[in-house]
From Swiss-Prot:
Its main location: membrane. Pfam families: ATP-synt_D. GO terms for cellular component: plasma membrane. It is a peripheral membrane protein. This is A-type ATP synthase subunit D. GO terms for biological process: proton motive force-driven plasma membrane ATP synthesis. It is found in: Cell membrane.
Length: 214
């Protein structure tokens, strides 16, 4: 006999166990639906992450090429002086949103693309190549922040998928089969008890009839 639960083999326990099996099967169905929905959401975001990563690589190549041109145009020393005068970007705000019960980051980013005058180096003589390089790196920063949000979402969804999968498997391969094996065991036990009682009563009846015929 496969592994069973340690409970009394009574009719009351049998009824309770049958109710528990129904609840467990309902729970398994809901968890499986959640797991499937999470996996679909995961791959939707995964596709977005791949697209963002490709775009980020392209933008980084463009940004470093623009930086190289700016260095050629104004020189490394002047470029360093200009960079010292650049104002920092506004702070980003990180909130969360809910995806199938999973809290994932929602990064609210202020406008990162700025006019040359807003960058803080307007007082220094610059050229269009410097402005182009600055603009390209602002685009890189926007994409990098978005990619960070998406990749963290993937990480959290992946953890939840694994957690849900473990629960689904536990119900499907351990808990529900164990309860069903126990139900089968109790039913067999009760049938055996019933047969024994039947033969016992039959024997008692035969003894009583034999005594009455004397």
């Amino acid at each position: 006999m496969p592994e069973i639960l340690k409970i009394k083999p009574t009719r009351m326990e049998l009824l309770k166990l049958k109710r528990r099996v129904k609840l467990a099967e309902r729970g398994h169905k809901l968890l499986k639906e959640k797991q499937d929905a999470l996996i679909m959401e995961f791959f939707t975001i995964y596709d977005e992450a791949l697209s963002l990563r490709r775009e980020l690589i392209k933008k980084m190549e463009e940004a470093f090429e623009a930086l190289r041109r700016a260095q050629v145009d104004v020189g490394s020393l002047r470029l360093k002086e200009i960079s010292i005068g650049v104002k920092p970007n506004e702070e980003i705000e990180i909130r969360t949103r809910n995806i199938m019960g999973v809290r994932v980051p929602l990064i609210e980013v202020p406008e990162l693309k700025r006019k040359a005058s807003d960058r803080g180096y307007a007082f220094i003589s610059t050229t269009s190549t410097v402005d182009v390089a600055a603009e390209k790196f602002e685009e890189v920063l926007e994409l990098a922040i978005r990619l960070a949000e998406v990749e963290e979402s993937l990480k959290r969804l992946g953890k939840e998928i694994e957690k849900t999968k473990r629960r689904v498997n536990a119900l499907e391969y351990i808990i529900i089969p164990r309860m069903k094996n126990t139900i089968k065991f109790i039913e067999q036990h009760l049938d055996e008890m019933e047969r024994e009682n039947f033969f016992r009563l039959k024997r008692v009846k035969a003894i009583l009839e034999a005594r009455q015929s004397m």
